[in-house]
């Protein structure tokens, strides 16, 4: 049986060169999303792209493989994503952030407590 749930998708647009200390910014965001119990997160690596600088970054040339575009995508309930946006703004100031309303549809035995249950006293926390 399919279970449809309203959710929000947060996308953060970065470069492989973006750092927090010695780590990639995408790693820091992914780890924090996991620690915060978000329903799901993925890092996508682009083969080409440009941002506010207008500089094209591409994988077409082997000597230009640094700084390719990355997108960190996080999906969870609207309330939990709203709370996570402040984390993103703190770790990735100046990064482009987009928010979209999505409908998740799960078929089969998979379960995501963060989307299925609002958590204790509606906090959405599941730890």
Regions found by a protein language model. Give the residues of each.
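Positively charged, small/polar-rich N-terminal and surface patches that mediate targeting and assembly
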Residues: 1-127
């Amino acid at each position: 049986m399919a279970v449809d749930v309203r959710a929000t998708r947060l996308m953060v647009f970065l470069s492989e060169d973006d750092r927090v200390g010695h780590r990639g910014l995408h790693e820091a965001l992914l780890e924090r999303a996991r620690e915060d119990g978000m329903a799901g997160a993925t890092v996508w690596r682009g083969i080409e792209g440009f941002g506010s600088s207008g500089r094209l970054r591409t994988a077409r040339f082997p000597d230009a493989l640094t700084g390719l575009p990355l997108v960190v995508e996080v999906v969870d309930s609207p309330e939990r994503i709203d709370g996570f946006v402040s984390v993103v703004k703190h770790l990735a100031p100046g990064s482009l952030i987009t928010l979209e309303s999505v409908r998740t549809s799960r078929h089969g035995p998979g379960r995501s407590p963060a989307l299925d249950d609002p958590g204790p006293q509606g906090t959405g926390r599941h730890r």
